[in-house]
Amino acid sequence: MENFPTEYFLNTSVRLLEYIRYRDSNYTREERIENLHYAYNKAAHHFAQPRQQQMLKVDPKRLQASLQTIVGMVVYSWAKVSKECMADLSIHYTYTLVLDDSSDDPHPAMLNYFDDLQAGREQSHPWWALVNEHFPNVLRHFGPFCSLNLIRSTMDFFEGCWIEQYNFGGFPGSDDYPQFLRRMNGLGHCVGASLWPKDLFDERKNFLEITTAVAQMENWMVWVNDLMSFYKEFDDERDQISLVKNFVTCHEITLDEALEKLTQETLHSSKQMVAVFADKDPQVMDTIECFMHGYVTWHLCDARYRLHEIYEKVKDQDTEDAKKFCKFFEQAANVGAVAPSEWAYPQVAQLANVRAKDDMKEAQKPILSSIELVE
């Protein structure tokens, strides 16, 4: 295994944060904790339901970790939407993370997908059955155009996860494959469209800005995620089908060249994102900027990405990039480093156990006859 290119990663991260003029001021600490707990609490009760527990069959610790990660992402990034919208999006995106971590073959359960869809029957695939049940709670926040993007992008995501089941990084020379797969499983259109709830934006009035935001967010969001995930995925056997690794295979280039390709595309996308919306509707620009800054804060602070390890490694170094990275990291930590114990309670497993005990008590109650009830 090659050594992780720490200096290159620092330089790239610093340039990204400078390009977007990173300065997360989305919340006070109290507001952040309040929104985190609200979204988490509703989502935790959702996943503690017997139907969800039975059909998902996810390890409780993994489900808990997935939920905490997603609630952080949504609350930090969707800073302008209502708490109710945050909670419903948290549930939806937790479902996507659960699917992303799954290793089940979807083929058997997808044989009758369209027939069931057309007939209005419940889907055979348990993930689709649960996601479809929750979708109305998500879509009620959005107009028809944004809703269609959410539905379509979620379908693309499912297909992308299906492809990833084969651990296939593409054939050498298939230059379009890496970006095809990343767009498919990146949820870029779902994210881009879910920034514009109908209680804040008239999608007809802001149609051009929203359409452009969906187009731009498709790449920016996934490329930033790939860049900020590069460290945690570098030596993880489960994360070898990544955009960077697929660049190596399909473009037949070195890992350094693949990382440089991702870097240049991410930085270019960041420049575009800022420039395109600079003179547009101020509310649109504010929403996009809050998302970008919150999304970066989430990556820097969430334990899933292990970027605190980079910070600890370089905090005593005297290079310019190390100093800048540490300054940005500390800036993010000051606003976004909130211990899960402050907001992620009670745990899903605890709620599920309480529900199971309550159901058992109900089942054990004596059944009175109609005569006894009259008496």
From Swiss-Prot:
Q: What exactly does this protein do?
A: TS is a member of the terpene cyclase group of enzymes. It catalyzes the isomerization and cyclization of farnesyl pyro-phosphate to form trichodiene, the first cyclic intermediate in the biosynthetic pathway for trichothecenes. It serves to branch trichothecene biosynthesis from the isoprenoid pathway.
What does the record give as the organism's lineage? Eukaryota, Fungi, Dikarya, Ascomycota, Pezizomycotina
Q: Answer yes or no on keyword Repeat.
A: no
SUPFAM superfamilies given for it? Answer: Terpenoid synthases
Q: What is the effect of changing Q165H?
A: In strain: IBT2303
One GO BP annotation of this record: sesquiterpenoid biosynthetic process
**What pathway is this protein said to act in by its record?**
Sesquiterpene biosynthesis; trichothecene biosynthesis
Q: Which organism is it from?
A: Fusarium culmorum
UniProt family annotation = Belongs to the trichodiene synthase family.
Which Gene Ontology molecular function entries are recorded, alphabetically?
trichodiene synthase activity
Signal peptide residues on this chain, from the entry's feature table: none
Q: Cite any additional comment in the entry.
A: Trichothecenes are sesquiterpenoid toxins that act by inhibiting protein biosynthesis.
The name this protein carries in UniProt is Trichodiene synthase
Coiled-coil region list: none
Under which EC number(s) is this enzyme classified? 4.2.3.6
Q: Which Gene3D superfamilies does the record cross-reference, listed alphabetically?
A: Farnesyl Diphosphate Synthase
At the top of the EC hierarchy, this enzyme's class is: lyase
Q: Which reaction does it catalyse?
A: (2E,6E)-farnesyl diphosphate = trichodiene + diphosphate
Q: Does the keyword Lyase apply?
A: yes
* Keywords, ordered alphabetically: Lyase
Family matches, as InterPro entries? Isoprenoid_synthase_dom_sf, TRI5_ascomyc, Trichodiene_synth
